[in-house]
Swiss-Prot record:
This protein's name: Ion-translocating oxidoreductase complex subunit E
Name of encoding gene: rnfE
Domain of life: Bacteria
Residue stretches in coiled coil: none
PANTHER family: ELECTRON TRANSPORT COMPLEX PROTEIN RNFE, ION-TRANSLOCATING OXIDOREDUCTASE COMPLEX SUBUNIT E
GO biological process, one term: electron transport chain
InterPro entries: NqrDE/RnfAE, RnfE
Length: 232
């Protein structure tokens, strides 16, 4: 159980692919102009990570070490092709918005990296959980960045959600504030870099405060027995 918890915590926070490893920067910065696009690509990446980790882990005993990387790439490309066709069939608007970044998941360092570092060494269930956790960590980072850029740039949230979830999702659109002229800096790649930098700074502050709290707690625990011994 502790190993399962560690895999989840590592994927979502401690080893977040976007905020710690800084992998997959190209789609992270290019697609996160809206929350819908960010969520769509994040979920697609999560599905690919989960399925590829599961498949590669299941076949690891029969995969020759000398040609493992080409085999991994073939498996990843097959899964990405299936996901791309599903998005094309059931979310065509999102498919048009994401464009080339769906097939580019094949070359994403996150997917290949988890296949080599984790799935090739662990069991199928734990590997699938690792892929899901890493994918959801990246999805959360994409979604926060996409929401931030969309709100600052257009004053809206979940604009175009119907392209991902269907026509009923039009009701999810929120106009945070009205603007006649979009804030282009937030919508363009420089705004993505600035937003990502802010997210990295916030994560660093949270981690530092957590370390300080743990250090204070450890000192308090170490001082308490000394006091008891002194009184005795």
């Amino acid at each position: 159980m502790s190993e399962v918890k560690d895999v989840i915590v590592q994927g979502l926070w401690k080893n977040n692919s976007a905020l710690v490893q800084l992998l997959g920067m190209c789609p992270l910065l290019a697609v996160t102009s809206t929350a819908t696009n960010a969520l769509g690509l994040g979920l697609a990446t999560t599905l690919v990570l989960t399925l590829t980790n599961l498949t590669i882990s299941s076949l690891r005993r029969w995969t020759p070490a000398e040609i493992r990387i080409p085999i991994y790439v073939m498996i990843i490309a097959s899964v990405v092709s299936v996901v791309q066709m599903l998005i094309n069939a059931y979310a065509f608007g999102l498919y048009q918005s994401l464009g080339i970044f769906i097939p580019l998941i094949v070359t994403n360092c996150i997917v290949v990296g988890r296949a080599e570092a984790f799935a090739a060494k662990k069991g199928p269930a734990l590997s699938a959980l690792d892929g899901f956790s890493i994918g959801m960590g990246a999805t959360c980072a994409m979604f926060v960045l996409g929401s931030l850029r969309e709100i600052l740039g257009n004053g809206t949230l979940f604009d175009g959600a119907d392209s991902l979830l269907g026509s009923w999702a039009k009701v999810l659109r929120i106009e945070v504030f009205h603007t006649d002229t979009p804030f282009l800096l937030a919508m363009l790649p420089p705004g993505a870099f600035i937003g990502l930098g802010m997210m990295l700074a916030v994560k660093y502050l949270i981690d530092e405060r957590s370390k300080q709290r743990k250090a204070r707690a450890a000192r308090a625990v170490s001082v308490a027995p000394a006091d008891v011994t002194g009184k005795a």
